[in-house]
Amino acid sequence: MKLWLVRHGETQANVDGLYSGHAPTPLTERGIQQARSLGDYLQAAPFDQVLCSELARTQHTADLLLAGRLVPRQIIPSLNEMFFGDWEMRHHRDLQKEDPRNYAAWCKDWQHAAPTNGESFQAFAQRIADFAASLGQYQQRANLLIVGHQGALSLLIALLLQMPAAAMWHFPLAHGCWSLIEQRDDFTTLRVLNSQAQWRAE
């Protein structure tokens, strides 16, 4: 099975440098063009199914990428980005002033601290691990397109490669790029990371 991983297009929150987990934030014009370009890059990819998070920015990206292709879609809540609670749509400079104790704790030990009234990294990692474990149900799908978020997809890559959760930072996913993981005979291989090349069948 091949897992085609795509981060949603650029959003206004990305441009403004804000924490955007579950908060709605629309694609920018650049983000819209990124998604359309991905449709060109992956026009020949034989997707059997597309999985998106509940958040509109992933679904909008999938709409633009697929451009009318009739690919079955499933909304997967566990693919949602980490929930930042009171920090949603806030800049780190503001948090340093307005929530200094909790923000300092988060910066010092992000794997065990949590955003104020938000989701801990441990809970987030478990949610993504549960999704990874559920991929077996899609074995009849040879090519699965997953449109998600920076944190969720980077963490998914690390977990599928049987690496510690903290290794997610080795796999930053850029806007407007596609990545590819292949699972075969109980082995998982990262074939492509952050490509803007036109995919062609081998």
PLM feature segments, named:
Residues 15-18, 101-115:
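Short, basic/glycine-rich phosphate-binding loops at helix/coil junctions
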Residues 3, 142-148:
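Generic beta-sheet signal
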Residues 4, 74-76, 191:
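General small-molecule cofactor/ligand-binding pocket signal
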Residues 4, 10-64, 115-129:
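Loop-to-helix element that buttresses phosphate recognition and phosphoryl-transfer chemistry
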Residues 57, 152-153:
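Alpha-helix capping/helix-boundary segments
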Residues 37-101:
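Phosphate-coordination/substrate-recognition cap region in phosphate-metabolizing enzymes
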Residues 41, 82-94, 137-143, 158-202:
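Acidic, low-complexity terminal tails and accessory targeting/binding regions
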Residues 9, 150:
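Active-site metal-binding loops of divalent metal-dependent hydrolases
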